[in-house]
Amino acid sequence: MYMDPISDLLLRIKTGTKTKRNSVVVKTSKLVTNILEILKNEGYIEGFKTESIGKNKNQTVVNLKYRNNVSSITGLKQISKPGLRIYSEAQKLPKVLNGLGIAIISTSMGLMTDKNAKKNNVGGEVIAYVW
C-alpha cells in the first residue's frame, strides 16, 4: 500500500506534538527535507537530522519545538492530496489565519511559503497549511 510522504510527515508531527514528544522519526525524501527546512526557517520546529539506517535507507529525526510546554505547531492540514491536487494563482494564494500561519506552496521555483510566493509572483500547488 502506498503512503503519501507528505501526509505521513504531517501525521507524525501532529501525533508527536499531541503526545508531547521531543522528536519524531520520518522517512527521508527531497520533498520531506524541503518541507522540514521551511518549518525550521519559520520557527515551527527546532531542527532535523538525517540518519542512515542501512544500505540506501535513510530516516530523518525531527526535533519538535515547545514554548512553556506548549507546541509551536497548533495545527497542520494537508491541502493537496495524491487524488485531488489543489492549485492557486499568485494573486489568489490563501492566507492562513489572517497571516498568523503559513501555507506551503510547491512552485516552479521550488517549495516556499505563501508570503515568498506572493513576493515572487508565482503560484503553484498548495501542499499544506501550518499554524
Curated annotation (Swiss-Prot):
Q: Which domain of life is it from?
A: Bacteria
Q: Which UniProt keywords apply?
A: Ribonucleoprotein, Ribosomal protein, RNA-binding, rRNA-binding
For this UniProt entry, the molecular function terms from Gene Ontology, in alphabetical order, are:
rRNA binding; structural constituent of ribosome
**Gene3D superfamilies this protein is in?**
3.30.1370.30, 3.30.1490.10
UniProt GO cellular component terms = ribonucleoprotein complex; ribosome
Question: Quaternary structure per UniProt?
Answer: Part of the 30S ribosomal subunit. Contacts proteins S5 and S12.
Record keyword Cell inner membrane present: no
UniProt family annotation: Belongs to the universal ribosomal protein uS8 family.
Q: What is this protein called?
A: Small ribosomal subunit protein uS8
Q: Which GO terms describe its biological process?
A: translation
Q: Which Pfam families does this chain map to?
A: Ribosomal_S8
Q: What does this protein do?
A: One of the primary rRNA binding proteins, it binds directly to 16S rRNA central domain where it helps coordinate assembly of the platform of the 30S subunit.
